Each structure stands twice: as C-alpha cells, then as structure tokens.
Curated annotation (Swiss-Prot):
This is Transcription antitermination protein NusB. GO terms for molecular function: RNA binding. Keywords: RNA-binding, Transcription, Transcription antitermination, Transcription regulation. Involved in transcription antitermination. Required for transcription of ribosomal RNA (rRNA) genes. Binds specifically to the boxA antiterminator sequence of the ribosomal RNA (rrn) operons. GO terms for cellular component: cytosol. Belongs to the NusB family. One of its GO terms (biological process) is transcription antitermination. It comes from Listeria innocua serovar 6a (strain ATCC BAA-680 / CLIP 11262). CDD domains: Terminator_NusB. InterPro entries: NusB-like_sf, NusB_fam, NusB_RsmB_TIM44.
Length: 128
C-alpha cells in the first residue's frame, strides 16, 4: 500500500474512533478488513498514544477556534498530520503538509483544506 493510501485509511480509522468511540483495534480491522499495512497502523496507534500532546500542539494554532468545535474529519486529519510532523523523522514536513491538503480536498472541502493548510503551516517548519 502506498503511503497516500495508508494516510487515507488511517484518517478513516481515526474518524471512526472519534465519531463512534470505537476501539483502536476495531477501527483498524474495520478499515483494513483482511489487509495489513504497518505504516497505517503506526499512524493510528501513534496518534492515539499521543493524542493529548497532539491536541495541545493544535489548539493554540486554531485562531479563534476550539478543538471541540472542529468537524471530526478535519480534527482527525490535523491529528494525523501533526503526528507525522512531530514524531516521524522520515517524512519531510512539506510532504505531510501537501498530503494533508490533498486528502482534505477528498474527504472535506476546499474551505477545510485551506484551514488545515493554515493551521499546519503555523506548526510545521518547512525545513525538516
């Protein structure tokens, strides 16, 4: 599975966890069915293990928004992206930013992709 697809599947799993209060294992199983992808699982597990710290990074960059007011797709995608930016050294920040914007265009809307871009641009230095 390509990393873009792994990110999309991770977003879907994180969304299920957030919306349905589903367990991490059940969400991964629902999304992946009989497939397995180590990167997708690393993303979901990493976001959930570091959720409080990730949210603490996101919240001050929301510019007059509260994290609990964000729609669940945007919140899940922001968490996923911040995890990649802050915890994974092998993913350049520019790649994570671009992937997030493109995925937002698919699963959310143009306004959300611009919002996500703005939040992540405040969080991620482009030189990593």
């Amino acid at each position: 599975m390509k990393r873009r697809e792994a990110r999309e599947k991770a977003l879907q799993a994180l969304f299920q966890i957030e919306l349905n209060e589903m367990s991490l294992d059940q969400a991964i199983k629902n999304i992946m069915e009989d497939e397995q992808d180590d990167y997708m699982e690393q993303l979901v597990e990493g976001v959930m293990a570091n959720k409080a710290e990730i949210d603490a990074i996101i919240e001050p960059n929301l510019d007059n928004w509260r994290i609990d007011r964000l729609n669940k797709v945007d919140l899940s995608l922001l968490r996923l992206s911040v995890y990649e930016i802050k915890y994974l050294d092998d993913v350049p920040n520019r790649v994570s930013l671009n992937e997030s914007i493109e995925i937002a265009k698919i699963y959310s809307d143009e306004k959300s992709s611009k919002f996500i871009n703005g939040v992540l641009a405040n969080i991620a230095p482009e030189d990593k």
